[in-house]
Amino acid sequence: DRRIDNVVVLTGDEHQNYAGGLWLDGSQPEGAPIAVEFVGTSISSRGDGSDRGADYDRFMAVNPQLKFRNSQRGYVVCEATPTVWTTQFKVLDKVSDRSGVLTTRQTFAIEAGSNTLTPA
């Protein structure tokens, strides 16, 4: 109701990566979101995880507020400037041994004054 811009919520330890909008009623995401949320996985969880699990399409279809979901291990890197917030999802292809390769799986930007995710 207060229409506050630039609201970003960071959470973690979900063992998955997520990015999406937050609405007052998440079951009916209509209009502009009230905030943006980034959920980061942990880098030290058991198992290598996967980019997209078997239920990916179904899960995304019933959660239209989400713009990204990934189950690989890693971390997020966030940068805030006066004009844009940027979040990078860094993931490893495996953590089960030391040969895992780190990559940037997805990057999102939020322009100042907005509560909308944009792939960067």
Model-derived features: where do they sit?
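Long, structured stretches of catalytic cores involved in phosphate-ester chemistry, encompassing
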Residues: 1-120
